[in-house]
Amino acid sequence: LLLRLIVLSLISSILLAACSEQAGERRTYVLTTGTTGGTFYPVGVALSTLVSAQEDAGFSLTAISSAGSMENIKLMRDNQAQFALILGIFGAWAFDGSGPIRNPYEDFRSISAMWPNVEHFVLRSDLVTDGTIADLSNLAGERYSIGMRNSGAEQTGFYIFDALGIDYSNELSIAYMGY
């Protein structure tokens, strides 16, 4: 039911944009997703397949892979994509021009919330002392994979480290790896 509502919301939003196109033309829009190993990519491919199957809609949607939320906002700002899957916090940062996003993107709009996001920090057992978020301070001097450059994982990870007072740029050896 949730997927059906999301698809209907997406189709309705795109229909409004497609109404200005000449009759008989099938316009193609780009939906930027995330890495092929993450969750955004298969969800984006499924959405584009469902939308594109609606032949009477007058448009189609092509899903492309990317580094994730941060790159997706840049691709939309540069008009290389018309739709994007992003983490909710990135939507707020993009609209306000806050966090890692320098300039407000005031024409940025949300169509639908997809699912709540949960951050996972995986540590070796020898770095876990009490099983709480305080264990992240045990990472000092360690190599830590934060995700891909320009990804949501990278930026939200840095945001959380900052909030916890962890100086990741000096205390950790950051590695940029995908899922």
In which residue ranges do the predicted regions lie?
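Bacterial N-terminal signal peptides that target proteins for export
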Residues: 1-6
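C-terminal motif of bacterial Sec signal peptides marking the signal peptidase cleavage site
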Residues: 15-18
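Bacterial signal peptide processing site
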Residues: 20-22
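A short small-residue
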Residues: 24-28, 97-98
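Bilobed "Venus flytrap"/periplasmic-binding protein-like clamshell domains
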Residues: 26-54, 59-62, 117-179
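Pocket-flanking alpha-helical
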Residues: 48-49, 62-104
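A structural signal for short loop-to-beta-strand junctions that line the ligand-binding cleft
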Residues: 102-119
